[in-house]
């Protein structure tokens, strides 16, 4: 039974951050029903030699400290990305720092990488690993605000998580840590990602045991910026790119009273921009690097559009705020129906269909 429609009218009684905390506690206590719908074979897909039960994942940000990975997987996600985690604990930016744009089905945040640090994060991942629990889990790593040499923090994050996560993401695109997005420039990204890859490879000399390393970039990159990202990732042998993070732009269509808040905008207002940038990136990499499409997904049609624009996998987060966890099985069912209706036998067959 989907209880979210009964709960949602009471959400305005809490700040968005309080409501998020309540959702984490509810998931910990098993109060959120699991997805019992049968798996549809058309949604199975293989990326980086990993077999995903479906391509619909949870983006980083919901479970920053890897506390509720298994309850989240039980909602029907094909994979869950925990983080962003910083090497040392930090509180992030002052509150309030999270705003619901109800009229727009969007969210603005300026968290600033609030994190308990790597120690509890890898403890949680280690417990899962030791127990042999199923499910595909990514680790999204970032930098502490006060760190001058960003590479040091990404090396620390990659080194600590590479034996415990199924894939790793270097987040260089949050708009809420000063100077972070400058790391997307060609020279800076080449140095940082090169160091991160070396850290992974040094930690795991056997290439067969290494988790894929991805980079998460901003949808605000212009064509020259995208070209730089594509060139650097191809040159270095990065395994994948997530397009994209939140945007600092503000569409004219926004109606919420919170539309002027500083921070990154996510949710429905981000869909058009992030999907266009995804397609532009796909034209540059042409299947040589798998892409993950994120930004504004709230339906099976949205997920399908991302796949047709070049995404091998997709991620969502903000839509859960407005539609609740029952959205996940609805997206999967609709996506499967759309793939079959268009004659695709698999997700992989549809990747980039609108860009070819």
Swiss-Prot record:
GO molecular function: dihydroorotate dehydrogenase (quinone) activity
A biological process from GO: 'de novo' pyrimidine nucleobase biosynthetic process
Location within or outside the cell: Cell membrane
Subunit annotation: Monomer.
Lineage: Bacteria, Pseudomonadati, Pseudomonadota, Alphaproteobacteria, Hyphomicrobiales
SUPFAM superfamilies, A to Z: FMN-linked oxidoreductases (SSF51395)
CC cofactor note: Binds 1 FMN per subunit.
GO cellular component: a single term: cytoplasm
Pfam families documented for this protein: DHO_dh (PF01180)
Source species: Azorhizobium caulinodans (strain ATCC 43989 / DSM 5975 / JCM 20966 / LMG 6465 / NBRC 14845 / NCIMB 13405 / ORS 571)
Sites where the protein binds FMN: 60-64, 84, 140, 171, 216, 244, 267, 296, 317-318
Protein name: Dihydroorotate dehydrogenase (quinone)
Cofactor: FMN
Pathway info: Pyrimidine metabolism; UMP biosynthesis via de novo pathway; orotate from (S)-dihydroorotate (quinone route): step 1/1
Principal subcellular localization: membrane
Active site: 174 (nucleophile)
Similarity-based family: Belongs to the dihydroorotate dehydrogenase family. Type 2 subfamily.
Catalytic reactions on record: (S)-dihydroorotate + a quinone = orotate + a quinol
InterPro entries: Aldolase_TIM, DHO_dehydrogenase, Dihydroorotate_DH_2, Dihydroorotate_DH_cat, Dihydroorotate_DH_CS
Alphabetic keyword roster: Cell membrane, Flavoprotein, FMN, Membrane, Oxidoreductase, Pyrimidine biosynthesis
């Amino acid at each position: 039974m989907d209880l979210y429609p009964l709960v949602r009218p009471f959400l305005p009684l809490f700040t968005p951050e309080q409501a998020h905390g309540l959702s984490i506690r509810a998931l910990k206590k098993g109060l959120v029903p699991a997805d019992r719908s049968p798996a549809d074979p058309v949604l199975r897909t293989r990326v980086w030699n990993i077999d995903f039960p479906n391509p619909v994942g949870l983006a980083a940000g919901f479970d920053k400290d890897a506390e509720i990975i298994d309850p989240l997987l039980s909602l029907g996600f094909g994979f869950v990305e925990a983080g962003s985690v910083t090497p040392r604990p930090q509180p992030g930016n002052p509150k309030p720092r999270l705003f619901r744009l109800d009229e727009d089905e969007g969210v603005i945040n300026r968290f600033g990488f609030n994190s308990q640090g790597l120690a509890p994060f890898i403890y949680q991942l280690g417990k899962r690993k030791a127990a042999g629990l199923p499910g595909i889990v990514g680790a999204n790593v970032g930098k502490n605000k006060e760190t001058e040499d960003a590479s040091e923090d990404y090396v620390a994050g990659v080194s600590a998580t590479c034996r415990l996560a199924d894939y790793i993401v270097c987040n260089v695109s949050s708009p809420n840590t000063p100077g972070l997005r400058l790391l997307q420039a060609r020279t800076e990204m080449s140095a940082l990602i090169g160091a991160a890859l070396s850290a992974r490879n040094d930690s795991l000399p056997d290439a067969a045991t290494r988790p894929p390393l991805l980079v998460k970039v901003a949808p605000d990159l212009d064509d020259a910026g995208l070209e730089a990202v594509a060139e650097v990732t191809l040159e270095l042998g990065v395994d994948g790119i997530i397009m994209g993070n939140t945007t600092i732009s503000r569409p004219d269509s926004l109606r919420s009273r919170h539309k002027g808040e500083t921070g990154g905008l996510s949710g429905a207002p981000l869909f058009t921009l992030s999907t266009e940038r995804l397609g532009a990136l796909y034209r540059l990499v042409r299947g040589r690097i798998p892409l993950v499409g994120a930004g504004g997904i709230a339906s099976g049609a949205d997920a399908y559009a991302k796949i047709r624009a070049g995404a091998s996998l997709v991620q969502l987060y903000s839509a859960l705020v407005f539609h609740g966890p029952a959205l996940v099985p609805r997206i999967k069912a609709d996506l499967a129906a759309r793939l079959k209706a268009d004659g695709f036998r698999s997700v992989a067959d549809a990747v980039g269909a609108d860009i070819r």
